[in-house]
């Protein structure tokens, strides 16, 4: 996959488009509840709560198989290594890591936390897993950091009263996690984490990126209006933070430009919080993805469109 390609999965097929909207590939699958995740040149498509999993490149399906247990989450690396979190007969869940030839590289059984999500590093040598557990009426979350050449996790970070929603391994070697009450950058080498508390604001939308870290839209109220836009870089530094007097339904960031989707329009901002443009995205726009600092893909109800920033 090229960084400008658009990849779409429906309930029947995996489809790849180039940046001029030309269809490059369409491959059928049989998953009733497919989930798509990409990393660099590869994509993984798996059957949520099913056993089917596929690894796709731009030119071909590299792997198509059924695992022994139902899949909770999966991730693929640019190197071809892929991993799956699955249910387990005797434990709360299992992590299995596979090499590009489908041979098993690593196995871990979870006995204290229910595994929820996984992210692999670009080279596939390490990864991060989120888990949840209930304690005294509250939900606790955990992040395990794995080196797949070591039997046990090399780091473990616990979170009280913060339900982790998504996780991403970063190019810096750190890990980003987004929760419903706060976000964190974990630094495994130092066994420390840097937390950003939402201070009672509501998480409206977010984006995780292996190079730029995370960008968040935090609303003052549950209706999503009057947001604060925050970017935390891959070292845990708050790189930008500014108010936006709009309801933000999707957000993206690329090379100094933040884009927010609000009421069918994309508004762009500099790192200083200055509005630099407004562009029509269509009334059916649901989500945006900035694939450069001058271009975005827009996901509509029945199509994907491009928007160019002047």
List where the protein language model places each region.
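Residue-level marker for isolated small/hydroxyl-bearing positions within beta-strands
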Residues: 9, 46, 84-86, 129-130, ...
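A short beta-strand motif characteristic of beta-propeller blades
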Residues: 20-28, 59-66, 103-109, 151-158, ...
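Non-cytosolic head/periplasmic domains of membrane-anchored proteins
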Residues: 22-131, 137
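Acidic, serine/threonine- and glycine-rich low-complexity intrinsically disordered segments
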Residues: 108-230
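Structural motif
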Residues: 13-15, 51-55, 90-96, 135-146, ...
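Repeated scaffold domains used in trafficking and secretory/extracellular systems
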Residues: 1, 29-41, 68-78, 112-122, ...
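Hydrophobic beta-strand positions that form the internal "hydrophobic ladder"
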Residues: 6, 43, 80-83, 124-127, ...
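Intrinsically disordered, low-complexity segments enriched in Gly and acidic/Ser/Thr residues
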Residues: 190-281
């Amino acid at each position: 996959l090229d960084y400008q390609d658009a990849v779409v999965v429906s309930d029947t097929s995996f489809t790849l488009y180039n940046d001029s909207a030309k269809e490059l590939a369409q491959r059928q699958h049989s998953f009733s509840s497919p989930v798509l995740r990409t990393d660099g040149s590869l994509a993984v498509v798996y059957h949520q709560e099913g056993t089917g999993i596929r690894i796709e490149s731009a030119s071909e399906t590299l792997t198509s198989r059924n695992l022994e247990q139902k899949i909770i989450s999966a991730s693929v690396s640019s190197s071809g290594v892929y991993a799956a979190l699955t249910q387990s007969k005797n434990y709360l869940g299992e992590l299995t890591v596979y090499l590009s030839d489908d041979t098993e590289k690593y196995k871990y059984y979870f006995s204290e936390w229910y595994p929820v999500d996984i992210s692999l590093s670009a080279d596939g040598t390490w990864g991060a897993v989120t888990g949840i557990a209930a304690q005294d009426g509250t939900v606790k979350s955990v992040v395990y950091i794995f080196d797949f050449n070591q039997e046990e996790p090399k780091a473990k970070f616990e979170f009280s009263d913060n339900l982790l929603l998504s996780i991403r391994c970063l190019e810096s070697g750190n890990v980003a996690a987004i929760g419903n009450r706060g976000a964190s950058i974990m630094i495994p080498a130092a066994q420390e984490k840097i937390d950003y508390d939402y201070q009672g604001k509501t998480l409206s939308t977010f984006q995780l990126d292996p190079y730029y870290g995370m960008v968040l839209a935090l609303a003052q109220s549950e209706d999503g209006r009057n947001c604060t836009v925050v970017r935390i870089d891959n070292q845990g530094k708050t790189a930008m933070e500014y108010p936006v007097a709009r309801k933000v339904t999707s957000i993206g960031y690329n090379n100094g430009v933040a884009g927010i989707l609000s009421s069918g329009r994309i508004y762009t901002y500099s790192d200083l919080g200055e509005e630099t443009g407004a562009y029509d995205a269509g009334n059916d726009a649901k989500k945006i993805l900035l694939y450069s600092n001058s271009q975005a893909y827009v996901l509509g109800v029945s199509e994907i469109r491009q928007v160019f920033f002047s």
